[in-house]
Amino acid sequence: MNHTENLTNKDAIDKLKSLVEDILVCLFCTNLKTDDGATSRPMSALKVCDQGNVWFFSEKNSDKNQAIEADNKVQLFFSHPGKSRYLIVNGEAEIMFDKAKIEELWTPVAKIWFEQGKDDPDISVIKVTPNTAYYWDTDGNRMINLLKMAAS
């Protein structure tokens, strides 16, 4: 049996938060419109805020940041095969150099990529504002839910 449910506003954001917190690592895709296909790389989501934005750290001169500057449309693919949960987020990315936001999002694990810590000159923050998100929660091989989420 296949069930579809549309969530908006707070319900959508709450569901997005719970899924991202459970999965954390996603494939972060840029260059969505190229003939060679999208460019994807694994990224750890830091937080989903109350507005529904998904936050990441990135090196300021990375290929990813350059791709976002050229075209800010992105897709995030989260997958938890052990729990049969899958999430796709379509949105727009913005690169920021906000020290207060870096301080807010900082975790000790981030020092693996940014050896100088919160003050590393190469650190940037990426904010992904979702336009839509689709979530599948399956029980074995059976589809249970497909949720369409639109963050406000």
Cite the ranges covered by each PLM segment:
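Charged, gly/pro-rich active-site loop segments
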Residues: 1-8, 89-152
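N-terminal leader/targeting segments and the immediate start of mature chains
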Residues: 1-25
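A short, Trp-centered hydrophobic/proline-enriched beta-strand micro-motif
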Residues: 18-35, 74-78
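Short, surface-exposed beta-edge/turn micro-motifs
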Residues: 23-25, 52-54, 71-74, 84, ...
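Histidine- and/or cysteine-centered catalytic micro-motif in compact active-site loops
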Residues: 31-33, 59-61, 79-81, 90-94
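A positional/architectural concept
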Residues: 36-43
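A short mixed-secondary-structure module that forms the rim of ligand-binding clefts
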Residues: 46-83
